[in-house]
Amino acid sequence: MRLTILLLLVVQQIARPASAADTAAVAPWKINTPIVTYWAGPALTDAVARQMAEGGWNLVWCGEKQLDVAQRHGLRAQLQDGLLRPETLDNPAQREKLDALIARVRNHPALYSYFITDEPGAAEFPALGKLVAYLRQRDPAHLAYINLFPTYASNQQLGTKGDKVTAYQDHLRQYVEIVKPSLVSYDHYQFAKGGDNPDYFLNLAMIRRAAQGARVPFLNIVQACTWTPSMRVPGPDELRYLVYTTLAYGGQGISYYVYCHPGHTGGIALPDGRPTPLYHALKSLNRQFVAIARELQPLRSLAVYHAGMSPPGSVQLPREAPFRFDPPVAPLAYRPSERVRGFVLGYFGKDEKPTHMVAVNLDYKAEAAVWLIGPGNLEAFDAKAGTWSATGGVRLELRLPPGGGKLVRVAK
């Protein structure tokens, strides 16, 4: 009987909801390793998890029963469960089940985040804010993940009024003020058969500003497939462009739509599990993303400048900028739907002083060579090796592959 009572007490302790005392000493969620994930993938088996880990993905989607699978392969897990929705809080019985779920999973080594919803309108923000606060109170160590609409969503979808920029700005403002997220995530798919959506950089810039205002990181969900005759499957060079432009704008997470899902062509894996050409390309790019984003994580994104074409949302590189091209890159006329050509320079540093810079060749169809001048002796980062090397002066020739980039810094 004494043993039975002891076991009962242990079970009750494990299953009981977290109290304020339980979570007072728990550190709040931090992004830690930059995120590489996906949207819409297969059920998480050992074979799938092994493929994802080998490909450089580090955050997988799963249910409670698959958390152990993620752990076996050194992966972080985003939990999906029907209880993780605002309506649960309005039903005492469902809320009790949610509390029990949190109590069961919050100490699992693989748990990283809770998936809440995709593309909510502004009218849903108050209820989502309550759920995010509820989860944060009971499990502050794990992220409550919500993904937002892109700029091309309608005003009806966004739940705001005005022109495209005004409506989207208001949508983002309400989101960060009401929901108070720990990370801002959005999706934007621009590769159409008739050309490229012109607002990719506008969306990046607006998300960057919103995340900076909230002092949280952001994640970019990018296109890796087609799901309709009007869109095209991007190639490896276009994926490189998405990876490096996300880095230049200060992104700390990237996600690919889709990994593998019915009704979609391309993606990362085929329905039978075999990897696509994009998987093999991303195997290296994913690791480059993490390596560069980790170097930039202690810093602040200070500015983003374009040289060459000026797509919507871009700011042209000032002539006397701390990091600049020599000779300067000539301005190019931009016409919507054509691919953007030129360069992006993302400045990073502390105390408003740029010490690091990510340069990106925006032409995903051609290599580029350009001379860069910095505010001091420069060092270049090898994203594949994870090492820095001196360049011998303040000038550096950058030879960038299609859509590729380079991280440089002022020597310490």
Residue map of PLM features:
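Universal eukaryotic N-terminal targeting presequences
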Residues: 1-2, 53
